[in-house]
Amino acid sequence: VDCIKKKTDVVNKITKDLNLNNVEVTWANVKNINKNYDFIVSRAVAKYNKIKSLCSNKFLNKNLNDKKNGFILLKGDNAKAEFYKCKEHHEFSIHDRIKLDYYKTKKIFYVPNPYIHMDN
């Protein structure tokens, strides 16, 4: 979901070129979306609390993957403080896998659905 059509057009092209059939790209404002998702993926557009508030009630209740439904967020190295109140979160260094200077300060933060406790 993105409100900028140019971005959604690019992502649609990438998903088509890679033959990714389990990806849905929507050109809209997240506030106007009435669907639910396994994962919400974001790239450093806002602080975690803002993203969390925009995405309340946007997760599917049933987990269909190895990881629990939740947020997957690309953030800079200084974003760790955004997650100090999270009951559970995991941080991954991108540079550990992609040895480009650009990724030295980039992290992926995974936060399981913070709205409900899910055991399945």
Labelled PLM ranges:
Residues 31, 37-61, 73:
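A short SAM/SAH-binding and catalytic strip from SAM-dependent methyltransferases
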Residues 62-81:
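Conserved beta-strand signature within the Rossmann-like core of class I S-adenosyl-L-methionine
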Residues 78-120:
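Active-site capping/gating segments
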